[in-house]
């Protein structure tokens, strides 16, 4: 089924993880702005049972990620960190640690448009969010469809 996979496309996502000195009042817990270079920002330390460090995760937009995908992690962090500080209204002096990660195939941009593929003998299945769309529900629906097919419920 390799031929079926040729049309599936993915966008990369460059991600910054930063530990900051605790902020008195963070300006937000999460922020989404698809038109910004930092399309998604979250206060990871807002989750229950976390330490006192202010830990933030920022994900770049697909366009920004494509532009800088081949940069090394240090360069990516050096570019993204000032943007995060700007969005949080802080200076770099608040930063204790920062690192970047490249997800080359982070988000499906052109899904398969069916819940799964399998070989003709139905002994090998492939599924996931890449089959139906870039959301958790797509991954769940894909897995559920595979299970139903195996059980003969489809």
Predicted regions and their residues:
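Flavin-binding catalytic cores
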Residues: 50-55, 60-104
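A conserved FAD-binding loop/helix module that cradles the flavin
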Residues: 118, 123, 128-154
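FAD-binding beta-loop-beta segment adjacent to the flavin cofactor pocket
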Residues: 45-53, 97-126, 130-132
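Central helical "cap/lid" subdomain
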Residues: 1-28, 90-93
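Alpha-helical elements of Rossmann-like donor-binding domains used by nucleotide-donor carbohydrate transfer enzymes
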Residues: 36, 40, 79, 83, ...
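A residue-level signal for beta-strand positions that form part of recognition/binding surfaces
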Residues: 15, 38, 55, 123-124
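Anionic-ligand binding region
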Residues: 25-58, 66-68
């Amino acid at each position: 089924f390799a031929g079926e996979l040729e049309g599936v496309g993915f966008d990369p996502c460059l991600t910054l993880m930063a530990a900051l000195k605790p902020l008195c009042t963070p300006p937000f817990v999460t922020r989404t702005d698809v038109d910004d270079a930092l399309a998604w920002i979250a206060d990871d330390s807002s989750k229950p049972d976390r330490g006192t460090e202010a830990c933030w995760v920022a994900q770049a937009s697909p366009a920004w990620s494509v532009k800088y995908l081949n940069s090394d992690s240090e360069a990516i962090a050096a570019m993204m960190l000032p943007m995060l500080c700007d969005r949080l209204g802080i200076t770099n002096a608040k930063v204790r640690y920062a690192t970047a990660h490249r997800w080359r195939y982070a988000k499906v941009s052109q899904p398969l448009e069916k819940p799964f593929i399998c070989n003709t003998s139905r002994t090998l299945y492939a599924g996931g969010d890449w089959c139906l769309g870039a959301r958790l529900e797509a991954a769940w629906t894909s897995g559920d469809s595979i299970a139903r097919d195996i059980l003969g419920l489809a």
